[in-house]
Amino acid sequence: TLSRGLGDVYKRQMSIGRTFKESMQKALRSLETGRHGFGWDGKDPAGPSREDIERKLHVPNCERIYWIKVAFEHGWSVEDLFEATQIDRWFLVHLKEIADEGANLADLDLRRAKKLGFSDKQIALARGESEDSVREKRKGVGILPTYRLVDTCAAEFEAYTPYYYSTYGDENEARNSDKKKIIILGGGPNRIGPVSYTHLRAHETESN
């Protein structure tokens, strides 16, 4: 079962994007809670009162992030949210920017929407279209994922084991190669990412 409290237990979610806004929406999707980002997925609460919002914001848990979006939609300011949650204003400012842009998601430029981390599913629901329709329109105008390099050596010397993340920028840093390629699929809650698990899966693959 999914523990919904935070407390002092170490929990994390990792995602990489060009901006915090893109990374945040990617992280929320990867939680596998049925949400497709920072809302706009048909699962936001309908007609909550101010008391409902205050109560949900008061206790840190895995649902509070979505209530921050609801609060912005109901006219709360960054300062209101800071007073209610004590979350650093830097994060709240960026979350508000997502909320402000998402309010016009149905009419938002597709490239802009993708750079903000909105999924095809979110865009489809906002526009009353199918996810496949949005994807085909996006591909038809050349809005495709690009891949950016994560420099594991901080530019001190060439990285021979870099990794990449997908985004919707203009520059693609993926290196083309004719070498034989292997895809390692990680299942379960840890998948691929934590160094120890990745290391074990890589050696397991080499031994087969």
PLM feature segments, named:
Residues E63-R64, S130, G188, R201:
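Residue-level preference for nonpolar/small residues embedded in alpha-helices
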Residues K11-S15:
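Feature marking long nucleic-acid-engaging regions of large polymerase/nuclease enzymes
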Residues T1-L6, Y10, H199, E206-N208:
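Single conserved hydrophobic/aromatic residue that forms the stacking wall/gate
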